[in-house]
């Protein structure tokens, strides 16, 4: 018989660990953001507000050498650099960044080709290690978009190029053709006044539909959700994985059929229970023997959707003999050099009366980037972190609620059975630190007694969840064949089993979840 239907696994369904959005971002790194705060400084009206920006100008536009009086045929020796150029294009910076050149036009110095709805693109950064006179550009979130950590952040696209800015609306709420994007200009602070101010940096500030679908905040320094300097340091954590699938669906029961369906909850015609006749004795015994030789119920049988609950052994029993971390693990900057400074080329001044003096070497560039000392590096204990991370994800998060606490400034639902509440509660890291270097085999009591099979490393549950697919709303179709699981070493009485003995299969449509039922 067949069972068909559509299943809504609910908003807590999450068939993966971690996050699908900005998963490589540090968990405490903010999105480039703006916020508003009171002005600071002597003689400033404290009631006045000013906008502050924290961001990254990742996109670099190199300017070619177009200065007056420059011989383009002359060459100069550079160390980790390239010829500098004058900032002739800064006068047009108010139009934005020049992303490309329109080769069909003659005057190529005025063609600012950026489309501000999606350019500069956040995934495009520097394409050269050399430092030049350049414009830098990037994107930032306006103060109206409430800050969230970059880890786990998602904003749905609002145009076909992938831009995420909101569409501006009229006073009556009707959408317009314009997007909520403004240009913010920045320059190096000038000593002693407003002279010589030219923007070196342009940020495209926008409001977006910012969401965090599969993460939650676990460190929140400010009580308010609004954008602020304090909320720059929020830290996120992924929501727990939650596989949801049908339990072992079909329970076999052999009973004697006295033609009146005595002892059966429902008759054969009602189809609430599937009652099928056995074959003759030889056929049935041969089929049982075949099934027994093929495998047992700890295998995965997708035909019956009956994968048996099975833990990862490391989850139930902690075998701890320390971590193999004898070798240090280093990481280095991408350019392989680290922090560098710009140096001018010089040479001895051999002019009359200039002994022991030096002069600018006109054959060497003014910008030579040179690093001093060791390459900048950081060390991390990879093995210890992997072990601790495993223990926290697989042991600490599944401990009883009494072992956990609510982070400061985080408000959780009063219903302790909700997915949001379970995710918001965190366990002290010291709970799993205690297992490092014990050198023993531990069977944790909560893992055996508190929902022992509701765990994301339950391979049977995970498999049954995968059979339904990775969507929240899923159509399902379970086909149960006429031949069912055989009972090993079944003792059959003499007689014709075609009419006297039947298997009844109870349709067990109970859902199982990694968070508990």
Swiss-Prot record:
Family: Belongs to the adenoviridae hexon protein family.
Any further remark recorded for this protein: All late proteins expressed from the major late promoter are produced by alternative splicing and alternative polyadenylation of the same gene giving rise to non-overlapping ORFs. A leader sequence is present in the N-terminus of all these mRNAs and is recognized by the viral shutoff protein to provide expression although conventional translation via ribosome scanning from the cap has been shut off in the host cell.
Region: Disordered, residue numbers: 1-48
UniProt keyword Metal-binding, yes or no: no
Protein task: Major capsid protein that self-associates to form 240 hexon trimers, each in the shape of a hexagon, building most of the pseudo T=25 capsid. Assembled into trimeric units with the help of the chaperone shutoff protein. Transported by pre-protein VI to the nucleus where it associates with other structural proteins to form an empty capsid. Might be involved, through its interaction with host dyneins, in the intracellular microtubule-dependent transport of incoming viral capsid to the nucleus.
Record's signal peptide: none
GO CC, alphabetical: host cell; host cell nucleus; T=25 icosahedral viral capsid
One Pfam family cited in the UniProt record for this chain: Adeno_hexon
UniProt source species: Human adenovirus D serotype 8 (HAdV-8)
KW RNA-binding (keyword) present: no
GO terms (BP aspect): microtubule-dependent intracellular transport of viral material towards nucleus; symbiont entry into host cell
Summary of subunit composition and partner proteins: Homotrimer. Interacts with the capsid vertex protein; this interaction binds the peripentonal hexons to the neighboring penton base. Interacts with the hexon-linking protein; this interaction tethers the hexons surrounding the penton to those situated in the central plate of the facet. Interacts with the hexon-interlacing protein; this interaction lashes the hexons together. Interacts with host dyneins DYNC1LI1 and DYNC1I2; this interaction might be involved in intracellular microtubule-dependent transport of incoming viral capsid.
Gene3D superfamilies with a match to the protein in the record: Adenovirus Type 2 Hexon, domain 1, Hexon Major Viral Coat Protein, domain 3
Annotated protein name in UniProt: Hexon protein
